[in-house]
From Swiss-Prot:
Residues 48-161 are annotated as: Disordered. Residues 48-107, 117-129 have a biased composition (Low complexity). One of its GO terms (cellular component) is extracellular region. This is Allergen Asp f 7 homolog. Residues 1-20 form the signal peptide. InterPro entries: Expansin_CellWall, RlpA-like_sf.
Amino acid sequence: MAPQFLKALTVATALGATLATALPVQPKPTVWHTTTQVVVKTITKTATVHGTPGPDYTVPPAYTTPAAPTVPTDAPQQPSYTPVPSAPTPSSSSSYSAPAEPSSSSVPAPPPPPPTTTSTPAPEPTTSTTPPPPPPAMTTPPPPPPPPATKPPVVSIPPIGGGGSTYTGPCAAGSPCTGEITFYDGGLGACGTNIDTNGEDAIALPIELMGPLSNNNPYCGKQVQISYKGKTATATVKDKCAGCTGNNIDMTRFLFYKLIRFPVAFTNSSNSGVEADGRIHGVEWHFI
């Protein structure tokens, strides 16, 4: 009986030693736990602005940033095993986990909105301005009366007799006038009749002698005797010469040729050279 008990005890002891040798001691695992804490700070600044206040404005509530979620950190799991029961030496493993710190986020309450200040501007003083009196009305003087119409000078024409010894005006038979003679083409004369320069004996007296009167001029129709170097001709006053001065007279071609080449009959061919003489000097004439 004793030998069997010892044998059994020896076997159990050997088995326990074998198990103790085969299973090493497991180290204690280290578990790390990370905690993230978000802190939001609100800073209130007050600024004073000088000037004209604007319209009322309501400040909206401050924006609150949500707290970041806490992410738990899982420790790695150790492989599970089933220990072989041993008699005297039990295998034990202990795991230490650090306590997790509570996650807290403190968000300060938004500051109260500033009081609304309404300023009423002071009324501006009313200035009463009296307009200046209107300027005096300008009185326009009446226009000066128009000058009296200028009347043409009255030319005193000496009375003209019926001719001969009864004529008492200038260039009479007893005191003939001496001047120059020229010729012209005739046409409508100042006395109101046409003048044929190639077919009649007609003259134009100087304007200084006849005056401004034309159709009813007393000299119109009077007879004049003209003498030049022994040649004498009688002509009728039918026109007025505006370019003649002094005692110079103008006449038709027909009369001019008669005085220059008399008694040769007047023809265009025989008297063509006479026109080159132009103005003839030293001619006497008088009314008859």
